[in-house]
Amino acid sequence: MFELVDNVPQSAVIKVIGVGGGGGNAVNHMAATSIEGIEFICANTDAQALKNITARTVLQLGSGVTKGLGAGANPEVGREAAMEDRERIAEVLQGTDMVFITTGMGGGTGTGAAPVIAEVAKGLGILTVAVVTRPFPFEGRKRMQVAEEGIRLLAEHVDSLITIPNEKLLTILGKDASLLSAFAKADDVLAGAVRGISDIIKLSGMINVDFADVKTVMSEMGMAMMGTGFASGPNRAREATEAAIRNPLLEDVHLQGARGILVNITAGPDLSLGEYSDVGNIIEQFASDQAMVKVGTVIDPDMRDELHVTVVATGLGTRADKPMKVVDNTLQPAGAAAAAPAVPRGDQTVNYKDYERPTVQRQSHAASATAAKINPQDDLDYLDIPAFLRRQAD
């Protein structure tokens, strides 16, 4: 007797949970932009704020703690509220393969509750990725300190953490931008990060990257970044990849030595083997030797000339394999740093007789000593760094 077996692959269940006011705004924005195949959840202590949410599932946290009010910018209240409803959080996340936790760090509910939600998700075996923003500078030093502590706690309970500093928006939008447009752009960036990663999973392509690949690259990796680049013309592959890597809206993290890398190339039928190779070669230059690299392609028949590249790099900060050498090319007066003997470090000692020599003699001696120590190999090592990354370092 034959038994019919359903061999149709099941799509990964992906959910996005926005926590607090900032997370709720981001979820509303994502739902409006029609990111397909994702279920949206909003969690907040403020019952009034939840009334304006369009997400399919809303979760009021800690009604016994806050009585339906907000957390009053107190992360401890947000944490207690989430702890009160741990079972309900687990219930709405049940059966999920991957969850994005998004919030604006620095407030009460988002900062306090997000680590608790992440801990619950991880306990259920869910691939847990947080995409959060740091406050704008004008929001105050106190809020920034609260955000930093919240990010530290959140990092302990997620597989990968993408941090987006709102300060970068000021550089891009300019100081004349309205407050509403600034916060709307922050929501755009959060939505873009979620869409970029989910599309890698959801969109099938000629060279496919599936959920298992994403899980391998993003599990237990810590600090991560996500960037997208678009380009057209004869050098579109290289330009799009470099644009994705140096995305100005992402945190200032060192890409050198990334341990996990996901790349998705989306282009029309005219995508060439050489362009595919160009993308891979650029990625290889900043990946560690042991990095898990997955490059997928999606052919969109409607695309003409333009090429899109999405890069997700994880496990950042471990750069032992290919250390990045930063060279300071800032011109300084000769011997300026040698006007006084160097401050001792470790077991070094100061020769106080040096102070008896005129400054001009000390400077001349220091300049000669520095010239004698120049190692030509240093310059050769520097050339191992991709040109566009050297320009960033300079």
Swiss-Prot record:
Record's Gene Ontology CC terms?
cell division site; cytoplasm
Cellular localisation: Cytoplasm
Note the Pfam families from the entry: FtsZ_C, Tubulin
Report any one BP term from Gene Ontology.
Answer: protein polymerization
InterPro entries documented for this protein:
Cell_div_FtsZ, Cell_div_FtsZ_CS, FtsZ/CetZ, FtsZ_C, Tub_FtsZ_C, Tubulin/FtsZ-like_C, Tubulin/FtsZ_2-layer-sand-dom, Tubulin/FtsZ_GTPase_sf
Give me the residues that bind GTP, please. Answer: G21, G22, G23, G24, N25, G108, T109, G110, E139, R143, D187
Keyword ATP-binding in record: no
Classify the source by domain of life: Bacteria
Extract one GO molecular function annotation from the record.
GTP binding
Main site of residence? cytoplasm
What protein is this chain from? Cell division protein FtsZ
Q: Which organism is it from?
A: Azotobacter vinelandii
